[in-house]
Each structure stands twice: as structure tokens, then as C-alpha cells.
Amino acid sequence: MPRQGIDPAQGRSAVQRVLASIDAGDTVDRAALGIAVRHFAGLLRERAPGHSVEVRIPGPIGTAFQCGEGPQHTRGTPPNTIETDPITFVRLCAGRTDWSAAVAAGEVRASGARADLSALLPVDLPED
């Protein structure tokens, strides 16, 4: 099935701009951050198809998606939920932040037996 969503070149460019801003201590461009978040979300959905875990990146530039094999959740609050902010999500996906360290620092809130993305991180950025 062909991937839909963010163009790979646009996604890579946005990720690079966001990481460069973070590294320089500059304000991160919100448009680039939104593209980077959605790009990584799409890549994670491809890498771990399914509906067992709900990943939430709240806010106007955030998103929510389901991934991971296992029981599908259909009503109410999902039993396996991960929530983090957009910058932490990009840093995790890019390999700039360790999963367990982010959870320990409270940058990621994960609940449920399947709420662990560590085996999927970092996310490789595909070529065009």
C-alpha cells in the first residue's frame, strides 16, 4: 500500500529544520514542527501497523494515531496510551532522546502493557 500524507522530501526537510533549531537553542518554526510530527507519525504507523496503542501529541500542531499489533480498541479511553509534546516526539523519533529517559523525566506519559515505542525508535527517514 503506498504511503499517504507528508511528502518524504518535505518531511525530511522539516525534521532537519526542527532539529537545527533545537540544537541552536532557537525558537522552532511551528509549521516545520507540525510537518515533522505528522511525518514521523506516518512513518511509525507504517513501521508498526495496527490499533493496539494510541499515541497522542496534543496541541494545535499535534496529532493522534494508533499503531502496534494486538487487540484493537474501539470505545472509551484506550488501555495503551502514550502522550508527549511535539518537540519530545521529534527528538525521540530522530534518536536525540532515549525512550526510558524521556519516560523517567515525565516528558512521555505511557500507560498500558503495550505502551512502549522503544523498539521502534529511532525512526529512519526514507529517501524519496
Model-derived regions: residue spans:
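Feature captures hydrophobic
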Residues: 1-128
